[in-house]
């Protein structure tokens, strides 16, 4: 999987001067590790016209009461930690597990953080030109699977007081679930309700989430089919909507 990253960070909204964006290509956009696969590589391509100095660091990705928290970790080895990518060139970053996770009961989650380091001449150059250099700051998820993977997503439908249909999911497995889109197909009326581009919908083991589907529709009890696009591909779940 490949995506083109056009850096337009929040600083761009706060600065009145022009913003110089940098283009990077990253592959893959998520890293999977485990007891039998304890090493991986990430390719970073500079699609811009100037060299880029990047710093790579691994951090632990945790979540408390729905709030993401990043903490230092020594569980992962990152090599090289600092590097320069010339225009049109590719840099390989290697990741490795420092500790074995064979006894882990559930998935461990980390992030590979890539930060751009300003070149020494940037400050003087941009001060003269009146431009603001927005530095790259990327976070790629790194998932370390347990020895035995158990996936168990539990879906149900409910109707809110305003008539909106809500899909509820709980992750009873021991690895994450990433949701991209939802579509609910009514087998009787052929209507389709959807929730598109669910930003940040990564459910860790033990987490639950409610997702409102649109548009509001007078759906019957069913049968309905919930089409869920996840990072493991599409899933189709047969559901009914409880009567009021």
What is the role of each PLM region?
Residues 148-186:
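A mid-sequence, solvent-exposed acidic-amphipathic segment
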Residues 48-70, 172-190, 230-232:
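Short acidic, flexible loop segments centered on an aromatic residue
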Residues 1-12:
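Bacterial N-terminal signal peptides that target proteins for export
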Residues 12-21:
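Hydrophobic h-region of N-terminal signal peptides that target proteins for export
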Residues 98-144, 149, 218-244:
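Terminal connector regions
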Residues 40-46, 95, 110-115, 164-171, ...:
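Buried hydrophobic-core signal for structured, non-transmembrane domains
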Residues 68-100, 191-219:
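Intrinsically disordered, low-complexity Pro/Gly/Ser/Thr-rich segments with frequent PxxP/GP/PP motifs
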Residues 21-47, 151-166, 200:
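Beta-sheet-dominated interaction scaffolds and their linkers
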């Amino acid at each position: 999987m490949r995506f083109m990253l056009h850096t337009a960070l929040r600083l761009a909204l706060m600065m009145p001067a022009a913003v110089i964006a940098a283009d990077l290509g990253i592959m893959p956009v998520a890293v999977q590790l485990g007891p039998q696969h304890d090493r991986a590589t990430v390719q970073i391509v500079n699609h811009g016209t100037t060299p880029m100095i990047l710093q790579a660091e691994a951090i632990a990705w945790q979540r408390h009461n729905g709030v993401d928290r990043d903490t230092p970790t020594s569980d992962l080895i990152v090599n090289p930690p600092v590097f320069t990518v010339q225009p049109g060139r590719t840099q390989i970053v290697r990741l490795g597990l420092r500790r074995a996770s064979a006894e882990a009961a559930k998935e461990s989650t980390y992030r590979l953080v890539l930060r751009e380091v300003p070149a020494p001449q940037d400050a003087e150059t941009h001060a003269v030109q009146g431009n603001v250099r927005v530095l790259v700051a990327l976070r790629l998820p790194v998932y370390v699977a347990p020895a035995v993977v158990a996936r168990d997503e539990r879906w149900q439908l409910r109707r809110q007081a305003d008539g909106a249909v809500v899909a509820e999911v709980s992750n009873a497995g021991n690895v994450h679930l990433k949701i991209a889109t939802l579509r609910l197909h009514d087998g009787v009326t052929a209507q389709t309700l959807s929730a598109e581009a669910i930003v940040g919908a990564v459910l860790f083991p033990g987490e639950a989430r409610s997702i409102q589907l649109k548009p509001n529709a007078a759906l019957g009890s069913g049968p309905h089919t919930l089409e869920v696009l996840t990072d493991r591909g599409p899933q189709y779940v047969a559901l009914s909507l409880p009567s009021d």
